[in-house]
Design a protein with these regions (language model features):
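Short catalytic/signature loops enriched in Gly
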Residues: 13, 17-23, 37, 101, ...
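ABC transporter nucleotide-binding domains
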Residues: 1-270, 339, 345-350
């Protein structure tokens, strides 16, 4: 077993515009496949297939896309939450606070013990059901956070009580069991749990799923407020484009296990370049607009046997012959605006 590995101290938020471009996370050509072997037959599901992007210091980076686009598999890979049959088969995932490993999946257990919760936390999909129903809320905080924060039991509990107050919860909830709390309260508890150690990086997977609109708005405002206060970076995943419009700073669009467009969020909504992004934005309801919404024909690709070339071409209204033959490269078409589309970037694949 390797010896102790020293980790960098938590970073302080940087106010200057130039410094804000410094990446906290660098994802490079990551490939993560579900590999199964049954009755002599091997099967690879290419859930994440060559994804590259950065998350900058003190920003909220959004990932959008329909179900089965690879969003959740990608963030599980980034978080190191990998279990068979999922395997990382290529690429690298480097955090600024852990530069010596090509991903958490490659780090030894003693390093993961130091990193998780203290430097990186993960609000999982369906996190309202993650809390242990047999333990009071304060016990869950002790289980995950006390070893990182240290101090006496009394000092720790006072810090937790102060922190849950920041997410607009009465500290009395700490003595409650999860089933005694509403859905919105449990979600606030999980967000408080993910931020109690003031991590540099937070991954949030569909944190507003199953919440009503009023509670959802409150939770989103709370996430933004805590992120600004701590200066953390957030990788925020949801299929809801309306949520991205109100919360994220930059937005990546995934389709068929690949990133197809990335830009500052206002730019994505004002000037979508990829046909799939245009469809996602066009499907949003608008007050006073009774125009029928046209559905996208076809089905998402089978990632165990994906179509050649661009994976969107069987459903794309702009598809050309080259689309079925060559994978479109991700090209910076406008400053800070990348897109992978032959129709938008003709000749880029040559």
């Amino acid at each position: 077993m390797s010896g102790p590995v020293a980790l960098k101290q938590p970073m302080t938020p940087v106010a200057s515009a130039a410094a804000s471009t410094e990446p906290v996370l660098q994802v490079r050509d990551v490939q993560a496949h579900f590999r199964t072997h049954h009755f002599g037959v091997s099967r690879d599901v290419r859930a994440v297939d060559g994804v590259t992007f950065d998350v900058r210091r003190n920003e909220i980076y959004g990932l959008a896309g329909e179900s089965s686009s690879g969003k959740t598999t990608l963030i599980k890979t980034i978080a190191g939450a990998i279990k068979p049959p999922l395997e990382v088969v290529g690429g690298s995932i480097r955090f600024s606070f852990l530069p010596d490993y090509p991903g958490l999946h490659a780090a030894p257990p003693e390093v993961l013990e130091r990193v998780r919760w203290r430097h990186l936390s993960y609000v999982m999909q369906g996190s309202m059901n993650v809390l242990n129903p047999m333990r009071r809320v304060i016990d869950t905080f002790r289980d995950f956070a006390w070893r990182h924060i240290g101090g006496s039991r009394r000092a720790f509990e006072e810090r937790v009580a102060d922190h849950v107050s920041r997410v607009r919860l009465d500290p009395a909830v700490l003595r409650a069991y999860p089933h005694e709390l509403s859905g919105g309260m449990r979600q606030r508890v999980t967000i408080a749990l993910a931020t109690i150690c003031k991590p540099e990086f937070i991954i949030a997977d569909e944190p507003t799923t199953a919440l009503d609109v009023i509670v959802q708005k409150d939770v989103l405002g709370m996430i933004r407020g805590i992120q600004r206060e701590m200066g953390s970076s957030v990788l925020f995943v949801t299929h809801d484009m309306g949520v991205h419009a109100h919360l994220t700073d930059r937005l990546g669009i995934m389709y068929g296990g690949r990133l197809v467009e990335e830009a500052p969020t206002p730019e994505v909504f004002a000037r979508p370049l990829h046909p799939y992004t245009t469809y996602l934005i066009g499907s949003l309801p608008r007050i006073g607009d009774d125009t029928p919404r046209k559905s996208l024909e076809g089905s998402p690709p089978n990632l165990a046997d994906p179509p050649p070339g661009c994976r969107f071409h069987p459903r794309c209204p702009l598809a050309m012959d080259i689309c079925s033959r060559q994978v479109p490269p991700m090209v910076e078409t406008l400053p800070g605006h990348r897109v992978a589309c032959h129709a938008v970037n003709p000749g880029a694949a040559a």
